[in-house]
Amino acid sequence: MRVSRYFLPILKETPREAEIVSHRLMLRSGMIRQQGAGSFSWLPLGKRVLDKVCQIVREEQDRAGAQEILMPTIQSADLWIESGRYNDYGKEMLRIRDRQDRAMLYGPTNEEMVTDIFRAYVKSYKDLPLNLYHIQWKFRDEVRPRFGVMRSREFLMKDAYSFDLDYEGAKAAYNRMFVAYLRTFARMGLKAIPMRADTGPIGGDLSHEFIILASTGESEVFCNKDFLDLPVPPADVDFTNDAEIGGVVSEWTTPYAATDEMHDEAAWAEVPAEKQLAARGIEVGHIFHFGTKYSKPMNAKVTGPDGQEHFVSMGSYGIGPTRLTAAIIEASHDDGGIIWPESVAPFDVALINMKVGDAECDRVCEELYAGMTAAGREVLYDDTDQRAGAKFATADLIGLPWQVIVGPRGIAAGEVEVKNRATGERENLPISAVPGRFGARR
């Protein structure tokens, strides 16, 4: 893609309403535009990142055995009345009526609808376990939306829902999602720490929030530093092996970790002082087992091996890709701008022509653009006539992992300069070696 043809509305000044780093950088880099309180349009650069975040989420959900569906944003109030949540849900839920005066709502979540789908088709334990997920826009009328897409009213969510015959099956499903989440965040360059969360009136111990450490985090967190060195499950982890998956979960839940709401001073005191880490954190995912909370009132049951009917045991598993995009920026930026992990970067390489109009600079840039693209890399070619300093500032701001800088002096020596955005390291490469230096996206 050529910058001269790309819709990239860079802002030179930081908008006054932006309170945190991710909000400032997303606005300045032209990723998003605010349309109203807690409502944003995703512009081309931001949409590319969002799509890549969603793709990683999909790949790991699929790997863990979940199946993607798509449910509508507008739901019938009847389902929520049936579950008992319609009157319990507060003003966060947007309630509407259609032209037939039927009560509808803009879904803030999808437990009722997915349970309705399940009960319509699944009647036997032989069709279990089942895990269905979708990625869809949600709306919650937040009292005070703030921090950009970190706490907005309209947001994108991946919601997965598991259905099992009994608690043991539900726990195995929970563990699979636990491991899938570890892999998901690691692939985005994040170290997410699972922290025990409140299970509310349902009770039990199957509820975890996944927290990344960031100075701008909303929550105060306490954890054992051992988490920082724990290995992430590999791509070939066997999701069909409950013992293997359970072992990973045990390893990741043994060290102490808690948000301030769940913090236990007595247990914290048992952690060696040199291993205690108190910091701020951002929630990027939440998994939760809720048993028969919805299956009972909505009569979602299957015939078990004993010939009796059983209400299915359910769990829900949420990741917000829009929020997650902002969280990645909070965890990976510097004074110059965003530093994207390669897996979610909107483009791999910023190709910078230092002297547009110079025949040799133009020729070399065109050759490199074609060569890197043919090698499988996504290249954003700055072919504009802006001064060099402005081009460098833009490249740093939007945070592409690599910058390839082409100028007359380097061409005379048969070289171009390559800069690593994350480390700042620079090297000179022969022009002919550049396409090979950037193989296909990993």
Swiss-Prot record:
Entry keyword Nucleotide-binding: yes
Keywords: Aminoacyl-tRNA synthetase, ATP-binding, Cytoplasm, Ligase, Nucleotide-binding, Protein biosynthesis
Class of this enzyme: ligase
Enzyme Commission no: 6.1.1.15
PROSITE patterns the record matches: AA_TRNA_LIGASE_II
InterPro entries in UniProt: aa-tRNA-synt_IIb (IPR002314), aa-tRNA-synth_II (IPR006195), aa-tRNA-synth_II/BPL/LPL (IPR045864), Anticodon-bd (IPR004154), Anticodon-bd_dom_sf (IPR036621), Pro-tRNA-ligase_IIa (IPR002316), Pro-tRNA-synth_IIa_bac-type (IPR004500), Pro-tRNA_synthetase (IPR050062)
GO CC terms in record: cytosol
GO molecular function: ATP binding; proline-tRNA ligase activity
Keyword Coiled coil among record annotations: no
Pfam family, one: HGTP_anticodon
Location relative to the cell: Cytoplasm
GO biological process entries: prolyl-tRNA aminoacylation
Catalytic activity: tRNA(Pro) + L-proline + ATP = L-prolyl-tRNA(Pro) + AMP + diphosphate
Subunit description: Homodimer.
Cited PANTHER family: MITOCHONDRIAL RIBOSOME PROTEIN L39/PROLYL-TRNA LIGASE FAMILY MEMBER, PROLINE--TRNA LIGASE
Family as reported in the entry's similarity comment: Belongs to the class-II aminoacyl-tRNA synthetase family. ProS type 2 subfamily.
Role: Catalyzes the attachment of proline to tRNA(Pro) in a two-step reaction: proline is first activated by ATP to form Pro-AMP and then transferred to the acceptor end of tRNA(Pro).
Designated name of the protein: Proline--tRNA ligase
Species: Chelativorans sp. (strain BNC1)
Designated gene of the protein: proS
